């Protein structure tokens, strides 16, 4: 099985990618992934949407792909996320329990070949082009969730939902300034939704602790 670890940083987020990259490279080398960090050639939509295009390209060349946002840090690389995913699953993601409901998140997103037509379907749902969660709203709709109806909840179980493996939050822990890091965290999403400078500072603050893990 060939696997790619995919991310990119554009429109001011290059610094975040630079901070994340050492941990991503160590994880990729340890578990046999090819690290892909090239941005899309042209931004025709808000940047977050272009994870769809780069993942389609990755799945043309590799059997499986792991996407992580560029403000994600690897806290513990000893285990490979892929080992937890059942063979029958098409994808693996987390759902975060938030004041806005149960929100599936693509900040850490594992995909297999059957996800190619799903990615194409997400791209076609351009009614979410400027939605607050960007392409994640389209993914949530295809899963059977209600991104436009708060609190977000599962309305119906779709085929995609049944083919989804729900990761434990240790694989996508949300980290924020002033909040202790969960000692079981393996992958930390650093202050998502905050200004780039806040995310970068948290990533810099976490780096010494993660190196000592």
List each model region and its residues.
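Catalytic core and acceptor-binding pocket of nucleotide-sugar-dependent glycosyltransferases
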Residues: 49, 53, 116-213
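Structured loops at beta-to-helix junctions and adjacent beta-edge loops in soluble globular domains
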Residues: 8, 95-96, 112, 170, ...
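Generic beta-sheet signal
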Residues: 3, 65, 92, 186-188
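GT-A fold catalytic core of metal-dependent nucleotide-sugar glycosyltransferases
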Residues: 42-43, 47-119
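Short, glycine/charged-enriched secondary-structure capping and boundary segments
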Residues: 20-21, 80-83, 203
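Anionic group-transfer/hydrolysis microenvironments
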Residues: 9, 69-73, 191
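N-terminal anchoring/stem segment of glycosyltransferases
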Residues: 1-62, 208-213
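A structural signal for short, well-ordered beta-strand segments and their strand-loop junctions
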Residues: 36-37, 66-69, 92-93, 152, ...
């Amino acid at each position: 099985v060939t696997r790619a670890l995919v991310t990119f940083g554009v429109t001011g987020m290059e610094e975040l990618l630079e901070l994340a990259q050492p941990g991503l490279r160590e994880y990729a080398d340890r578990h046999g992934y090819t690290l892909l960090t090239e941005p899309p050639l042209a931004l025709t939509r808000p940047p977050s949407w272009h994870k769809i295009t780069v993942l389609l390209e990755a799945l043309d060349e590799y059997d499986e792909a792991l996407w992580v946002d560029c403000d994600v840090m690897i806290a513990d690389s000893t285990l490979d996320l892929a080992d937890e995913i059942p063979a029958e699953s098409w994808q693996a993601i987390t759902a975060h329990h938030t004041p806005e409901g149960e929100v599936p998140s693509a900040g850490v997103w594992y995909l297999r070949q059957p996800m190619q037509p799903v990615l194409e379907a997400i791209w076609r749902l351009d009614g979410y082009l400027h939605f607050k969660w960007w392409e994640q709203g389209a993914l949530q709709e295809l899963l059977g969730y209600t991104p436009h109806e708060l609190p977000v909840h599962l309305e119906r179980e779709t085929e995609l939902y049944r083919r989804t493996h729900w990761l434990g939050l240790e694989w996508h822990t949300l980290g924020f300034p002033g909040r202790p890091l969960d000692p079981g965290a393996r992958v930390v999403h650093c202050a998502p939704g905050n200004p780039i400078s806040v995310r970068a500072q948290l990533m810099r603050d976490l780096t010494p602790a993660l190196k000592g893990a």
